[in-house]
């Protein structure tokens, strides 16, 4: 079992119960899923780009991503409906906890010029979204094997009712928020 999952059960959950005065353990916010999304607009011109993005995403997430396609044709971007324009992965369960552990302990500290995560990235319902500019911050990506540096979106969906609960939950996992 992942180290962070044990930490959630043993320390984070009881701390949140006392902090927010929950009457039941089931009211305590928990992380439901983590979604990784990589937009690959260049895939319209070159099909190989999508293969590289899928390979990188598979290495990072530990499971095969789903190719996302354009819903509408947009002449300005030279895309047609049904064109592959990105890929995404939804992590739940054990893989989610393992990814979260790698994100907090290894990937975030490797971000260049890092000054803390923005607190403004909560959506009002306790979910947190962050962007990563380089996929090379993850240890699974070998620097000499990548064709291009790509970024990705990471969305952490929680069962928190508001941003305060969501932030307290993520701070319990040592997320480095700006002060």
Curated annotation (Swiss-Prot):
Keywords assigned: Ribonucleoprotein, Ribosomal protein, RNA-binding, rRNA-binding, tRNA-binding
A Gene Ontology biological process term: translation
Record keyword Ribonucleoprotein present: yes
Keyword tRNA-binding attributed: yes
Transmembrane segments: none
Role description: This is one of the proteins that bind and probably mediate the attachment of the 5S RNA into the large ribosomal subunit, where it forms part of the central protuberance. In the 70S ribosome it contacts protein S13 of the 30S subunit (bridge B1b), connecting the 2 subunits; this bridge is implicated in subunit movement. Contacts the P site tRNA; the 5S rRNA and some of its associated proteins might help stabilize positioning of ribosome-bound tRNAs.
Binding partners and assembly: Part of the 50S ribosomal subunit; part of the 5S rRNA/L5/L18/L25 subcomplex. Contacts the 5S rRNA and the P site tRNA. Forms a bridge to the 30S subunit in the 70S ribosome.
HAMAP family: Ribosomal_uL5_B
Similarity annotation: Belongs to the universal ribosomal protein uL5 family.
Protein's name in the database: Large ribosomal subunit protein uL5
